[in-house]
Amino acid sequence: MKKHAFSLAILLLPLSALAVPPQQPVSEGIESPNYVWNADSGEKKEILKLKGNAERGKEAYRGCQGCHKPSGAGIPDGTYPQLAGQHASVVVKQIADTREGRRDNPKMFPFAGKHVVTPQEIADIAVYLQNMKIPRDNGKGPGTSLARAKDLYVKDCQSCHGENGEGNAAKFYPVLAGQHYKYLAREIRDIRDGKRRNANPKMVKVVKDYSNADAEAVADYMSRLLMPERSADK
C-alpha cells in the first residue's frame, strides 16, 4: 500500500520538480592549443552590441542578490565576489564564458544559464552593476606583507589593472579595487594551476612561479586598493 501511495505522489508532482537541472556545457579553454582568450565571437559579441538599461538591470539583478547581495558586495570571506562597480564589459565576458563553458562555475550556471537569463538582461545587469558604488568594507587580508606585495603588484599587475586597481574596460581587465582578499587569492592560485580555464595567457605567465604566499600577499594588497571617485561613502 505504501509503495502505491509513493508512486501516486510521484505522479502528482509538477514536471519542474522532476526535471534534471541543466548541466553547464564545456568548451575549449586554456588547456587547449586552440584556445583564444577573449575571442571576438560568440555570445559575448552579441551581448556587447546591445544597449544595457540600468533600470531594467536593477530588476533583473534580483536573481543574483541571493549570492552577490543587493549592494553587489558579495561575501567578505570570498565565497562570492564583489561585483559593484565592475566594468560592464568584464561582467558580460565572465557570464558569457560561464554560459558557453569556458569558465567552470556550476554554482552560478543554474542562475545565469541561457535557460534563465536573456542576452538583453545580461546587458542590463552589467550596466546596473557598473554604475553601483564600490563598497569599502570588503574582505581584507592580514596586512603582514604589504611592502613586498606592493613590489609584486607594481612589477606584475599594475600595467594592466592600474595603480588603483581600476582595470581597463576596453581590454576586459577587471576592476580589482574593493574585491575580497580570499576571492583574489583563490583566483590567482587557480590561474596559476590551470583551473581557471578562461584565463588570460599573459596572466598565467605572470603568476606561474608565484608561491601560495606570493598569491596571498598580492591579493591582500589588491584588496586594499581604493578608487575614491567610485567608492561608497564610509
Regions found by a protein language model. Give the residues of each.
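N-terminal export/targeting leaders of redox proteins
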Residues: M1-K49, S89, A96, S223-K234
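Axial heme c-ligation environment in periplasmic c-type cytochrome domains
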Residues: V20-V26, P76-Q82, T98-A123, L129-M132, ...
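Electrostatic cytochrome c docking/interface patches
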Residues: Q24-Y61, P76, Q130-L152
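Generic signal for short, ordered secondary-structure residues
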Residues: Y35-V36, E43, R62, P70, ...
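Extracytoplasmic/secreted proteins, especially bacterial periplasmic and envelope-associated proteins
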Residues: G52, R56-E59, V90, K107, ...
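Gly/Gly-Pro-rich "capping" loops immediately C-terminal to redox-active cysteine motifs
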Residues: A54, K69, A73-E100, G113, ...
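The canonical Cys-X-X-Cys-His
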Residues: G57, C64-P70, I125, D156-E163, ...
